[in-house]
Amino acid sequence: EMEFEPYIESCYQELADYVNAYDQKMVMARENIADRGIWTAKKRYILNVWDSEGVRYEEPKLKMMGIEAVKSSTPAPCRTMIKDALKLMMSGTEDEVISYIEDCRAKFKKLPPEEISFPRSATNVTKYSAHSTIYAKGTPIHIRGALLFNHYVKKHKLDNKYSLIQNGEKIKFCYLKKPNIIHENIISFIQDFPHDIGITKYVDYDLQFEKSFLEPLKAILDAIGWSVEKTANLESFFT
């Protein structure tokens, strides 16, 4: 900092003198020192930072700019897993990342539906309600799940156990495998998954893992040519 900044300032002043500028206004300061970085697009990057504005770290910290891998709409366990995966990308190998992803997949499948579901806000529940078809055409997926939840809670007379989803409610939703007994691929709920409806065994853990964990990582891994799983090739076939 004490060497580079004065040198850069002298270069700017030399340039200003060369072009006969009225005043030298250009300033540059050191921001981060990192040993690794991944750029997915302009102004979208991850840095493995050891020094930030003169503050030196004992362990590197991730700096993310324009990267939406960790969002509030992502299930909480996946947010932690994604952060750890990003750290591993900065310090490990592709094989180590793939192994970590498989470990995460195994742990993910042991979690209850409440922990792997997507958090959302239920706006306009009544707007999309339809008497004959439960929900209207074009209903957002989490609202469709909310209307299905309300319908089957009432159908199974579970109103005393589960509160119906109202406008503005904080909810969660998850995908279901088809075919299933409600003939739908989604269900929403408030806090407790509606096990009494009989759809627990249809929770699509593979699709949930794909959308909440793998898809956010793929955008970053693609930028460095890494994969989320081991791929077979002719060379590996003969070894």
Which residues fall in each region the model found?
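DNA-dependent DNA polymerase catalytic subunits
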Residues: 1-239
